[in-house]
Amino acid sequence: AEIGERPLTFCYPFNSYNEDVRRIVSENRIGTRIKQYAIGGEKSKSTVESLDKWVKELMISNDWGVTMIHGISTGYDAFTSPDILWEHFRRVKNQEYDIWVGTFREVAAYVKERRNVQLDIVKKESQWAVIPRLLLDKELFNEPLTMVLNKKGKGKVKVYQNGKRLLVKKTG
């Protein structure tokens, strides 16, 4: 039955899938959830400290995480106190300069784009041009990517996208 727009992401019922199912479900989708971190109460035994540890491990490994929550104050594996979740959110928010919080769709698209982007590097007289190429479907994959350039010397860096000059952020 046609029920509306086709979802661009998918999480497997009961976290159950195999490679054949994954291949079929992934077709024309940005991403499917194949990993998650269960948080909650009786089953997951989440504490503010355990959630801090999880976030720290993600940051050290330069990875991303998806939580799986079934109940906050009631329901399956509900938190022993909802304050645990709210405190976790506050702590993540306090690190927003170092942590990007996005929807599953945004993060899955960014990761896939980052893995698939190709850079063409061309020398033009005294300048270098770095031209990114992405062969993914532009309707599905349009998250802005970040490029880090390690530059030595006094030369200036100018960045253009579609003929428009972009702001360059210098760090360090």
Where are the language model's segments positioned?
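C-terminal beta-strand-rich structural cap/linker in extracellular carbohydrate-active enzymes
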Residues: 169-172
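Short beta-strand segments
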Residues: 7-14, 65-71, 102-103
